[in-house]
Amino acid sequence: MRLSKLKLAGFKTFVDPTTVLTPGNLVGVVGPNGCGKSNIIDAVRWVLGETRASALRGESMQDVIFNGSTTRKPVSRASVELVFDNAEGRAAGQWSRYAEISVKRVLDRSGESTYYINNVHVRRKDVIDLFLGTGLGPRAYAIIEQGMISRIIEARPEEIRGFLEEAAGVTKYRERRKETEGRLRDARDNLARLDDIRMELGERIVHLEAQAAVAARYRELDAAHVEKQQLLWLVKRNEARAEQARVAASLNEASSRIEADSARLQELETSVESRRDAHFEASEAVHVAQNDLFAASAEVARLETELQHLGEARRRLEARLAQLELDRGHWSSRRETLAADRARWQELAENAALRAEHAEARHLEIADRLPELDSSRQGADATMAAARRELAQTEQQLRVEETKRASALRALEALQQRRGRLEGERGGIVGPDERVLAEREARLEALQDELEVHQQELAAAQPRLPDAQAALKAALEHERAVQRRLTELRARRDALMQLQARVQSQGKLGDWLERHGLDQLPPLWKQLQVAAGWDEAVQAVLRERLAALTSPDPALALAAARTVLDETPPESLAIALPARSGAPAERANCAQGPLSPQGRVTVATTATESSTAIATDVAPAVLALAGLVEVRDPALRALVDDFLAGAWAVERLEDWLPLRAQLAPSTCLVGPRGQVLTRDALVHHAPDARTHGVIERQREIEGLSAELQAHEDEAHLAHDALVVAESAASALQERINGLRRELQTIQAQVHAEQVEVLKLAQARARAQERREQLARDLEDIVHLESAEREHLTRAELEQARAAELAELQRERLDAATEVLREREHAVREARALEQSAARELQEARFSERECAGKLEDIARNQQLAGEQLERVVAELAARAAELDATDDHRSAEALQEALALRGRREAALAARRDALAEAAAALKQVEELRLRTEHEAAPIRARVAELRLALQAAELAVAQFEERLVEARADEAALAPLLAAEPKESTLQREVARLAREIAELGAVNMAALDELTTASERKGYLDAQTEDLLQAIDTLEDAIRRIDRETREQLQDTYNTVNRQFGALFPQLFGGGRAELVLTGEEILDAGIQIVAQPPGKKNASIHLLSGGEKALTAIALVFSMFQLNPAPFCMLDEVDAPLDDTNTERYANMVKRMSAQTQFIFISHSKITMEFAQQLVGVTMQEQGVSRVVEVDIEEALRLADPAAA
């Protein structure tokens, strides 16, 4: 591939559509500074995919769009198009079959770029892939912009390796390896996550296996623990009852002894109080005397401390005086030493000044001779330069004419070849079949109509779905509420029935009844239905008869009674024996009322009558208790009436207390709370623990059963409503889902048809556009061939004239060069002498400044020594005066007086302490007597307190263990055989503790461990299979990376060797000698950087950074051209690469470019006349209108004349 033209529109300063033709292999771009030449380089870099605004000399990517000028408005978009000649089919992939390839990029103000290849919209990656490995790209070595040569030569080793990789064409391997590494990294991350999950899951499986074993052990231990704990509570309860009786007897005996001791202690308390007052007065007198002694002792201590401080101050002053004497001697000696140093350095300073004077005179003498020698050398240099310029101009003109001739020949040949290719391509263009396109469009229209129908159906169905879902949700909530209520009612009913069943089992009695076949006889309370509020009244009258076994058959009841008489039951038992006759008479008697004939009342025999019964003036109304009880079995009605005969129900027993004497014998009144009033007593019967509440619970069970039946009917209805709502919502949801699936299918078909129609339409447009483009290109080729033939004829005539003039100018140049060499030698010798004198003068002046600095330091030190000596003498006098002022005689006299006062106060304190001792002895005697009495009574009080605590503890223990047994639902009958063995409490305690310890040692027990273990094992098997798949994928990816690395290493190593060899050959050609090479910074070429070693002729520099700017530029050019020879890019762009080069090196550079142009097309920007001479074609860039660049035709001769200021 080679670049045939470059099209710009709206890009930076190229606001108008501009076409730059590049038919030759050496195309120069010329023009004044700031006219926009470098924008051509930026345009090529931009269209190849550059995304960094800084690389395009802008702050943002929108800066490449023309932003207006003084006469132009900003434009909305920028576009750049590269057109390549692909006659040899070197393009990559599907584009190799095109004779021409155009690459285009468009950017608008929104900041969005679009890329096209042959007018087909592509991705940026597709553009980069097209040139991958060719040396072209946004950051490849084939586009050398301003300053890039210096950046290449100063690049890091890793960056230079990147250039080598591009030259080797391994960047595509790098991309493949990067993608493979990404997939490998993802696979390893997934494997690491799987390993973590599998490890965690494995640990959990081990844990679950242990938990499953623990759960079985837990059930076994828990059953044994419950049994032993209940047995222990039963033993402790029995022992607590025995302890309670024993402690109560001991407490009564100890209480009587306490009362006698309390009277005697009262008398002794009175005597103790009088003795305590006398002791307090003596103690106050001792306190006063002791305070006086403390004050005297404090004064003595203060005076002793003061004398000690005076002695220490005197010793410190004497030590300071000795130190000051030493300091005075030191500073005196220091001042004498500094005076001797000052004299020595003064003499050295005078000698240094004399040497500086002599050196300065010699330097001035040599410097006066240099201008004359330098002027002579400059004259010879000017003569040689003039001769060289004349020869260079002539040779340049000769090369230009040769270049013009060769360029014209190549251009003609290229135009003929291009015309043939374009004509062939025009004949081979085939557009799409119009019939197929019409069929596709018709099918697309039909699919769109079908799509609209389905969308309407879906739009109609979707609004109905929320209503159906809401109805389903309401039905579901109602059904759940009904089920919750059913569950609550069943739980309540079942709990009550269990309580009734436990009451009916009757502990030990149940076994006895079962053994004698009496367990099927129902208790009496099951046959009764009591009016609300009178349960406790009926229980108070019936008491144990409430649990009496009943039978409607009198014979069966008598048989049960005979069984009881034959074998005594283990607990209380009643057998109801219904009478065969006489029941009506008893009910008639009940209707006579509870009072004797003197005080009759109105009696109601039923609950209904009770509400209307009116009391007489004598007593309130009453109701026969039997009238409040309904009997389910009519055969037992008489029996119940017999049991309740003589019992009357009253609302308020308080009203009957004054009338109790009038009650008839064997008659009683019963209140709602179960209190019973007879003629002689008011009795409150505590509820029987076994039968208490059975009537109320039975009534509640019957109510719950009725309510439960009603809710079950409601639950059936709610379930039917839920099924209907679920069916409606499910059908509607399924219909919507089906419509959505059909809609997605049709949309996919519509999209596919749209794509196909668009492809056919675009193909038709591209074919037509390409035919028109080829016609325009062929017309341009005809005009270009005519112009190139005229250029060929003119170049051949000018070439002959320039050859004769060049030979004469070479002879004049050789003579001028010899004269210049002699005069340069004389100038170098004079400069060496001047430098020697300057160094001598510099050393003398440095020595002079050093001596002056030393003298200043000595003067400062002398001043400091004098100041220090004066300070020491002054402080010495002050300390001597302070020592004379120190006196301690007055403090010694005051101390003696204080000691005498302290002696007197010690004697007074001793007398008062004796009086206090006598009072204390009297108080002690009385208190000892009281304490002895209290001590004698204390054991008795303690005994009483202990007994009271023991009694409370026993009562609490009984209640506690009773409560525990009830809460644990312990079956005492089942525990009786174990209790008969008289187990010891300590043994049971150890067993319970052992079992509890073993249960606690098990820790938290997961009873669902088995299910969790099965689930975890299945999941681990699935994860193990996934891990195997990932390991195989990782092995495959690692093999691919190793294969890529191997191929890359081999290709990169070959490239390195070839480029290094070519670099070593090109470097001496550009420098006229020297050596250069590339050196790896590591052993592995894939990771190692590359350093450049370059040594021009006569230099042994250790680093390329020591080279001049021109030498660095030539070195970088040699390196880039070495890469070109290995992997020639389709074209190379050079932006003022020759700027830092002198004429000689510019000529070498131009010759090198010319030789390289046989394989690579070069497009260069230059201001150098020498470089322009080598161009086969010149493209001029001007900016006649401010801010707007244009391309113009350039006459090579006129360009050379404008580039040479001397020719103007």
Swiss-Prot record:
Which residues bind ATP per the record? P32, N33, G34, C35, G36, K37, S38, N39
Location comes to: Cytoplasm
The organism of origin for this protein = Thauera aminoaromatica
Its name, as the record gives it, is Chromosome partition protein Smc
Pfam families for this protein: SMC_N (PF02463)
Q: Name one GO cellular component term.
A: cytoplasm
Give the similarity note.
Belongs to the SMC family.
Q: Does the keyword Nucleotide-binding apply?
A: yes
Q: What is its main location?
A: cytoplasm
Quaternary state and interactors: Homodimer.
The cross-references to SUPFAM superfamilies, in alphabetical order and at most eight, read: P-loop containing nucleoside triphosphate hydrolases
